Every structure is written in structure tokens, then in C-alpha cells.
């Protein structure tokens, strides 16, 4: 009986640790809002409403066929439009040790975040400080 229980525990752990696949990467396109931050201590902070959301846009680089893009902070408006400061943070998607990372490059330096989970309506990234950001797909305001 213990062996059966151990088998199901291992099966559960393996299924929960499904890695992000190359074909999942295009799901990153679009508007995303932070849903929860998990700090390295294990403490969490939930976000119910966000004044700003992140817009990700991906494309294939012409010179080396890598996935590149930018991230931009935008503020949703009640009319369905977005305000922005027009600052775009360039990035590329890189693969290391069977994991995908977003590598940002700005005039201030480079940083990277591991893509831990990427689905149609949710994704999680983790930075070098072991802080995880879980995003959910942004749903526009529906005021008419």
C-alpha cells in the first residue's frame, strides 16, 4: 500500500513540474497583470487591482531566428484604451539548462527572469533573488 501511495506522490510531483516548452513562448504576447508576488521567505502579496499592467510583444529576430521583443508598462483606461510613457524594455528569450529565461537589456545593464510557468491565462517568472511574480491575462474594463 505504501508503494502505491509513493507512486502517486511521485506522479503528482512530476506532473506539477511540467517545464515550459518552446511552443508555449508565443503565449507571452499580450497584456498581463500581476496577480501575486511570492518572496524568497515564502511570504506572498496578492494584487486585486493594478493601476499599471505589462504589455509583452514578441517577434522572431531576422538575423539569428531568436525570439526577441519588448515589455512596456501601460495604464488601462475605462474607454478600453491604454496610456503609456512609451518606454519599452527590450528582451530576448534564451534557453539554459532546459529552462527558458527572459533576458532584459537596458542602458543600465542586463537582468534575467526564469519563466517557471506559461499557460494561456497565467504565467510565473522568478528573478535571481528567488522572488516569483505570477501574472494573469488582463481583462479590460467593461463599462458602457
Model-based region annotation:
Residues 12-15:
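C-terminal motif of bacterial Sec signal peptides marking the signal peptidase cleavage site
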Residues 17-33:
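N-terminal helix-cap/turn-to-beta initiation motif at the start of protein domains
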Residues 45-93:
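N-terminal glycine/threonine-rich, aromatic-flanked beta-hairpin/loop signature
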Residues 81-116:
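An anionic, turn-rich surface loop/hairpin at beta-sheet edges
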Amino acid at each position: 500500500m505504501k508503494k502505491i501511495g509513493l507512486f502517486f506522490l511521485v506522479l503528482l510531483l512530476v506532473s506539477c513540474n511540467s517545464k515550459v516548452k518552446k511552443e508555449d513562448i508565443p503565449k507571452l504576447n499580450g497584456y498581463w497583470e500581476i496577480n501575486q508576488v511570492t518572496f524568497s521567505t515564502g511570504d506572498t502579496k496578492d494584487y486585486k487591482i493594478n493601476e499599471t499592467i505589462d504589455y509583452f510583444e514578441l517577434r522572431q529576430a531576422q538575423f539569428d531566428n531568436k525570439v526577441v521583443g519588448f515589455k512596456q508598462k501601460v495604464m488601462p483606461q475605462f474607454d478600453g484604451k491604454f496610456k503609456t510613457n512609451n518606454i519599452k524594455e527590450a528582451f530576448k528569450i534564451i534557453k539554459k539548462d532546459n529552462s527558458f529565461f527572459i533576458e532584459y537589456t537596458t542602458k543600465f545593464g542586463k537582468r534575467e527572469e526564469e519563466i517557471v510557468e506559461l499557460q494561456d491565462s497565467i504565467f510565473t517568472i522568478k528573478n535571481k533573488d528567488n522572488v516569483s511574480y505570477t501574472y494573469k491575462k488582463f481583462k479590460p474594463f467593461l463599462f458602457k
